């Protein structure tokens, strides 16, 4: 498989959580996602609605036919403790990006927290497989990304777009995600086979914690596309306002 294809898979893996939440906070964020969505309505430019609906339906089929079965099997054969360690490892690798975005947003406290977390978890936490920064020191990770940074500099959402596999986004967040990828060390793994293995491992591991979230969001709604779109925009607005 070519490195360009591997990069696409890696991007999908890294963005899978980003569409709804950063990896380590995925479960808690989803609960907040639902609560916040119920409280207020949101507006978003959606000039690509026809194409977006096609992509949404495609992603729906990919999820139920490929992603969910793989994640279920992975969950069955991998102990929860191992999956948590894997999640910690990948989350720790993304710390430099969160640190940079804290700096760019002028959030000194957040930058200091991310720096300390990375140093502690990379050493005491054995390359990030453990999270003593949270468990022993009470240093909770931030959730900053380049999309939020662009928003603080006055960039609006732009139009809504649903990417194949990657899922819901906006013009601003799409640009932001591309930048976030460049700060992740996994992108710079030279061997394509190792790169692809890490990408698929991250994706399967993350989805193993999120089984049922998508189904819950779709439940009892006549138009899941609109629900997903509005919930995503409101969730991102909430993140930016923090």
Residues of each region from the PLM?
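Solvent-exposed loop/turn segments at secondary-structure junctions
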Residues: 61, 129, 167-170, 234
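Short conserved catalytic/interaction loops centered on acidic-Pro-aromatic/His motifs
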Residues: 132-137, 172-176, 189
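C-terminal transmembrane beta-barrel domains of outer membrane proteins
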Residues: 192-193
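Positively charged n-region of N-terminal signal peptides that target proteins for export
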Residues: 1-4
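Mid-length scaffold segments of soluble, non-membrane domains
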Residues: 88-168
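N-terminal targeting leaders of membrane proteins
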Residues: 20-108, 136, 187, 196-242
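Alpha-helical transmembrane segments of helical membrane proteins, especially in multi-pass transport
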Residues: 163-176, 181-184
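Bacterial N-terminal signal peptides
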Residues: 6-17
């Amino acid at each position: 498989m070519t490195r360009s294809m591997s990069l696409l898979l890696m991007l999908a893996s890294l963005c899978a959580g980003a569409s709804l939440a950063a990896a380590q906070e995925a479960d808690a964020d989803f609960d907040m996602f639902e609560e916040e969505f119920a409280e207020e309505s949101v507006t978003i430019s959606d000039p690509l609605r026809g194409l977006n609906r096609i992509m949404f339906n495609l992603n729906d089929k990919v999820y139920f036919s490929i992603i969910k079965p793989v994640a279920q099997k992975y969950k069955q054969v991998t102990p929860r403790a191992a999956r948590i360690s894997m999640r910690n490892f990948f989350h720790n690798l993304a710390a430099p990006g969160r640190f940079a975005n804290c700096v760019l947003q002028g959030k000194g406290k957040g930058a200091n927290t991310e720096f300390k977390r990375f140093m502690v978890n990379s050493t005491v936490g054995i390359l990030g497989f453990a999270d003593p920064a949270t468990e022993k020191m009470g240093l909770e990770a931030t959730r900053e990304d380049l999309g939020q940074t662009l928003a603080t500099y006055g960039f609006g959402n732009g139009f809504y777009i649903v990417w194949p596999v990657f899922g819901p986004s906006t013009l601003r967040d799409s640009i932001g995600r591309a930048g976030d990828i460049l700060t992740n060390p996994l992108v710079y793994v030279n061997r394509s086979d190792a790169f692809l293995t890490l990408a698929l491992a991250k994706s399967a591991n993350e989805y193993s914690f999120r089984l049922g979230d998508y189904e819950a969001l779709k439940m009892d709604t006549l138009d899941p596309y609109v629900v997903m779109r509005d919930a995503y925009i409101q969730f991102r607005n909430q993140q930016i306002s923090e």
